[in-house]
Amino acid sequence: MQLPKFNELYKSLILTPSISSLEKELDISNKPVIDLLAAWFSELGFSINITSVPETNGKFNLVATYGQGDGGLLLAGHTDTVPFDDGLWTKDPFQLTEKDDKWYGLGTIDMKGFFAFVLEACKNIDLTKLDKPLRILATADEETTMAGARAIAAAKSFRPDYAVIGEPTSMVPVFMHKGHMSEAIRITGRSGHSSDPANGINAIEIMHQVTGQLLQLQRKLKEQYACDHFVIPQPTLNFGHVHGGDSPNRICGSCELHIDMRPIPGVNPDELFMLLNQALLPIMKQWPGAVDVYHLHEPIPAYACDTDSALIKLAEKLTGETVIPVNYCTEAPFIHTGCDTIVMGPGSINQAHQPDEYLDLSAIKPTQAIIQKLIEQSCKN
């Protein structure tokens, strides 16, 4: 099989749905995309290792390796996309549509298209002249649980010198981002008839106490923690969603609040979760058994790469850009456990998760050149 042309690679990736979602009716296996990548990288001489991701709906990771041993470069990305709103897209999400010097399609920049760039770079390099191994990692479920990246981190099956995650950064290297925590506080009261409010335990009234304590925790985080690389330097706490009760004439028997917390580098998610529980401890003592705090999903740690890293210096030299921090999350905390890691890929983050997601065609040639040089300079002595 001859490797398809760049635009055909792109078309095939976009044509193959790989949506991940916590809603089961929307969740799709990524195996067809994994199989495409396996065939293409195998054609270029890479050895292929495909593994199932535990506790997922038919999801798989792929590691394609050219060379032997540790060291070298890892180019990483996720194969899944977010769901799409059919009413907001003006183009078919699963067709690569060219218009106004742009390629439209779901995953063009977030981030299946990155693999087409990597394949094109590998096609134009004499891989036999590389002195160090080149690995390609394609993961599952980044858009939901990051189960694929977590599985790779747990396996510890290889250790490159450097890793580049090809999320859309307009090819500006990213060296730091905050983490993400989604937490639930559930209040269980005792319902009853509203004509006698004292004859029950009103969960909304207890939640009122909870929000007061959390506002104090907000202030504490701002006063005691800071990372000046970020525009908002402190770990944040946001009230995102609350629901409780079912009727005006009933005492509210249950109420639930969902909050978002963003740890900064140096602050472990476990530490923030402990502070959250400590803030609510007085209410827990006042109302034994009424307050339950739990993760809506497993926390994602913050990430930071040492600015003295040779990888950062190389990325800055190749792109002409200075490394930056960002506020969104990636798989970097899990990849970074084994090597120096940056986030850098084609396309603007402003297009991610948006209707009519697109890649600006003017980015293609510069991006291909940067990725090719990155491979050559990272994998040669």
From Swiss-Prot:
Cofactor: Zn(2+); Co(2+); glutathione
Pathway: Amino-acid biosynthesis; L-arginine biosynthesis; L-ornithine from N(2)-acetyl-L-ornithine (linear): step 1/1
Active site (catalytic residues): D80, E142
Top-level EC class as recorded in UniProt: hydrolase
Annotated residues for binding of Zn(2+) 2: D110, E143, H353
Keywords noted in UniProt: Amino-acid biosynthesis, Arginine biosynthesis, Cobalt, Cytoplasm, Hydrolase, Metal-binding, Zinc
EC number in record: 3.5.1.16
Cofactor: how bound: Binds 2 Zn(2+) or Co(2+) ions per subunit.
InterPro entries: AcOrn-deacetyl, ArgE/DapE_CS, Bact_exopeptidase_dim_dom, Peptidase_M20, Peptidase_M20_dimer, Peptidase_M20A
Reactions mediated catalytically: N(2)-acetyl-L-ornithine + H2O = L-ornithine + acetate
Cell compartment(s), UniProt: Cytoplasm
Quaternary context: Homodimer.
Family classification: Belongs to the peptidase M20A family. ArgE subfamily.
Function: Catalyzes the hydrolysis of the amide bond of N(2)-acetylated L-amino acids. Cleaves the acetyl group from N-acetyl-L-ornithine to form L-ornithine, an intermediate in L-arginine biosynthesis pathway, and a branchpoint in the synthesis of polyamines.
Protein's name in the database: Acetylornithine deacetylase
Source organism (scientific name): Moritella profunda
